[in-house]
């Protein structure tokens, strides 16, 4: 029944039994039980619980909520189950779904059935706010930090799942037909509109990640020829290919984790200091390894051979990236607007008229356009558009 907690966890009032609590696993409520599961960057709503006992062979089951997954009040999951990264769980789920390849989803229960809404959390203002707040809430003071935490929302770890998720959704559409009202996946149901939106959301996020990586790689260099661009795009290392994993906050290529495990098993790595040094090296080289992975995905996603890529191809990718970034930011902006709707003002202006309610709301919450999060989103649109335009200007004169 012992549990393992990593940095910046908060286990106030609630109950934890046999859990692996990665960084920022947070529960604040007396009625909350976290049991026999792996969690990280997780916020448990009041009354959330899980069962690891199906009254047959004892409490032998377990489950995983991947990084950033969170639960609403009174949610319930019957283990074994696996919830994809940055997903939201609402209601009671008893069908043992594995949604690890459909990250950023909603799992909503309707009449004892799990309905899955893939990718929708990508446009949620709550997801963006979470990603911004975690680094600010890191309370560690010691410069020698024992937990290596990568806060990136989009990384090879989540984008690899989106590639798989996109393929899964396209295959469901092909097999069951484009006109099906409901699709079945992993004992969950997906509505037709949700499936099509899911494909679109994942493609937007992939455009955003790969575009970001390319812009970063080509930053600050004046290129004269296409060959110079190709040479710069070539990765610095082979490390980073293949699958990536989240190791309690550290995002790293699985090949490097396997190499460390092999070293521990054969005795060449036999000190805690050496293990920590390996984790430190992976963390420090994250962006080098990330580029290796992204470079090889350019061909898969854009159908371009990096050996023959041209400045015009890069400009096409950057324009798609600009559309993705601005499109996603606009969705987040619209989602934030809901927090300033009339229905959100209902609890304000205790005894007053409609106008006093609105006035009280504005005194407490401010108005929409001057909200710090909203102004940050608008600034982000401006900055990213300028960043893309700068690269286009730098390479558009290169001859084919």
Label each region the model flagged.
Residues 2-177:
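Glycine-rich hexapeptide-repeat left-handed beta-helix
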Residues 100-400:
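Terminal amphipathic alpha-helical/low-complexity segments used for targeting or macromolecular assembly
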């Amino acid at each position: 029944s012992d549990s393992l907690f990593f940095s910046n966890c908060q286990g106030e009032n609630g109950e934890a039994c046999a859990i692996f609590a990665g960084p920022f696993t947070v529960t604040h409520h007396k009625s909350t039980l976290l049991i026999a599961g792996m969690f990280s960057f997780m916020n448990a709503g009041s009354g959330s619980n899980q069962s690891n006992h199906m009254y047959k062979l004892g409490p032998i089951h377990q489950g995983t909520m991947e990084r950033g997954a969170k639960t609403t009040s009174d949610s319930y999951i019957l283990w074994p189950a696996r919830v994809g990264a940055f997903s939201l769980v609402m209601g009671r789920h008893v069908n043992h779904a594995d949604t690890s390849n459909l990250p950023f989803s909603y799992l909503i229960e309707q009449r004892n059935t799990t309905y899955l809404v893939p990718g929708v959390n990508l446009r949620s203002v709550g997801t963006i706010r979470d990603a911004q707040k975690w680094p600010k809430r890191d309370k560690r003071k010691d410069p020698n930090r024992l937990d290596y935490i990568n806060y990136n929302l989009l990384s090879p770890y989540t984008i690899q799942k989106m590639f798989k998720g996109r393929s899964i959704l396209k295959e469901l559409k092909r097999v069951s037909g484009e006109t099906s009202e409901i699709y079945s996946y992993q004992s969950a149901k997906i509505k037709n509109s949700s499936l099509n939106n899911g494909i679109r959301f994942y493609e937007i996020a992939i455009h955003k990640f790969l575009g970001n990586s390319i812009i970063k790689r080509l930053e600050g260099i004046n290129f004269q020829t296409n060959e110079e661009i190709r040479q710069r795009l070539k990765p610095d290392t082979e490390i980073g290919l293949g699958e990536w994993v989240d190791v309690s906050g550290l995002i790293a290529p699985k090949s490097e984790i396997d190499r460390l495990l092999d070293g521990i098993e054969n005795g060449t790595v036999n000190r805690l200091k050496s293990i920590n040094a390996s984790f430190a090296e992976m963390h420090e080289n994250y962006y080098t390894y990330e580029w290796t992975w992204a470079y090889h995905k350019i061909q898969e996603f854009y159908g371009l051979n990096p050996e023959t890529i041209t400045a015009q191809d890069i400009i096409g990718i950057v324009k798609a990236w600009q559309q993705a970034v601005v499109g996603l930011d606009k969705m987040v902006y619209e989602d934030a607007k809901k927090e300033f709707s009339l229905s959100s003002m209902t609890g304000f202006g205790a005894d007053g008229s409609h106008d006093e309610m609105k006035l009280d709301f504005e005194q407490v919450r401010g108005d929409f356009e001057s909200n710090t999060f909203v102004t940050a989103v608008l600034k982000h649109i401006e900055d990213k558009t300028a960043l893309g335009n700068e690269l286009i200007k730098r390479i558009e004169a290169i001859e084919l």
